[in-house]
Amino acid sequence: MTAFYVGPPWQPGVYSDFAITAAYVSPQQHAAQVKKAATRYLGVMKKAATAAGVPCSCAYTSGEYPYLEIVKAAHRNRCDLILMASHGRRGISRLLLGSETSKVLAHSTVPVLVCR
């Protein structure tokens, strides 16, 4: 099993004549924040897999399009199956926010199992 985490990409702060509209985070600080979040999330996954007797490797990246990173990682690791959760968004929130799970389903040639 490979547990995988995709964090948000680094983006520079936005400046205007009046104020800084977003707190500046350097690329190095951003990478450290993504690593911290990934370590926390993947640690939970690895602990559960280990408790069930399932070997588990962990990997993470950041990217603008998480679904593409997931599909690429599945191919890179020669995965037989992608397991994803569904948050069950409905209506306007799904239209506005989209669904990474739906996008993986649409773009992956590797089978996808969706759990609620």
Question: What does each model-found stretch correspond to?
Answer:
Residues 13-16, 68-71, 94-96:
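Short, well-ordered secondary-structure micro-motifs
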Residues 47-82:
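Structural beta-alpha unit
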Residues 23-40:
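A short acidic, glycine-rich active-site loop
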Residues 110-116:
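Short, flexible loop segments at boundaries between secondary-structure elements
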Residues 4-6, 59-63, 115:
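Conserved beta-strand termini and adjacent loop/short-helix elements that scaffold enzyme active sites
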Residues 1-24, 48-57:
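Small/aliphatic-rich secondary-structure junction motif
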Residues 18-22, 75-77, 100-101:
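Short, hinge-like loop/turn segments at secondary-structure boundaries
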Residues 81-107:
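Glycine-rich, Arg-bearing micro-motifs that act as flexible, cationic patches
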